[in-house]
Regions:
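Short acidic/polar N-terminal linker immediately downstream of export determinants
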Residues: 1, 6-63, 74-96, 111-113
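Beta-strand-rich solenoid/repeat architectures in extracellular/passenger domains
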Residues: 11, 104-105
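Short "repeat-start/strand-capping" segments in structured domains, especially the N-termini
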Residues: 28-36, 48-53, 70-72, 96-103, ...
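Intrinsically disordered, low-complexity segments
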Residues: 5-8, 166-168, 185-187
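Periodic glycine anchor positions in long extracellular repeat architectures
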Residues: 107-109, 129-131, 149-151, 169-171, ...
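Structured surface interface patches that mediate subunit assembly and partner/cofactor docking
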Residues: 66-67
Length: 198
């Protein structure tokens, strides 16, 4: 038993960080992006807006560990490597942009759409892990949702030209609203509830 404890703790090479609870708000204007990729266990509130920017509220020593960078058309959000965060405290990430066509969650993070999405283009949502996503009012071209793992997606008031949803694993997808055509695929023990998607 003791050997297992030592071998487990030795996996963390970097420092152990606990939130200071000295809360600050960091605001940053961003280059244009229409795709978000987040890795980790943080939660995001996304809001469609005229400008591209991010606001992070949290403990000062946790906020400084969060890396946000636009590469091409993608905003990447992740914690710095080799840091073991044991207690973040409150952490709220607000992301704003004029348009959004892609979203990828890697890990156990979550995203809430504050005012939905209105786009003439498509919206592709991918969850790798146990992340969760929710919101209402999705006015899009093709809406594509894919879960690889045990993620959870709940979207309401959909108005899309077409819609596809797929699960590899034990995830759950719940959809309601309207679409021109829908296609579903499940590999594993996942569940897609789309009876209210007409």
């Amino acid at each position: 038993g003791i050997i297992l404890i030592f071998s487990a703790t030795s996996c963390f090479n970097g420092p152990i960080v606990k939130g200071s609870k000295n809360y600050i708000t960091k605001k940053e204007n961003l280059e244009h992006f229409n795709d978000i990729s987040m890795s980790g266990s943080a939660n995001i509130i996304y809001q469609q807006d005229s400008s591209s920017r991010i606001e992070i509220y949290g403990s000062d020593n946790i906020v400084e560990l969060l890396e946000t960078k636009v590469n091409g058309e993608t905003l990447n959000i992740k914690f710095k490597k080799n840091v073991n965060i044991i207690d973040k405290g409150k952490l709220e990430i607000k992301v704003f942009s004029p348009d959004l066509n892609g979203l990828t969650l890697n890990g156990s993070g979550g995203i809430l759409f504050a005012n939905g999405i209105h786009t003439e283009g498509d919206l592709k949502v991918t969850i790798n892990g146990s992340g969760n996503l929710g919101g209402s009012t999705f006015d899009t071209g093709h809406l594509a949702i894919a879960i690889h793992g045990s993620g959870d997606v709940r979207l309401k008031q959909i108005d899309s030209k077409t819609c596809s949803a797929s699960i590899s694993g034990s995830g759950n997808i719940t959809l309601d609203g309207m679409t021109g055509a829908a296609k579903y695929n499940i590999s594993g023990s996942g569940n897609i509830k789309a009876a209210d998607l007409e």
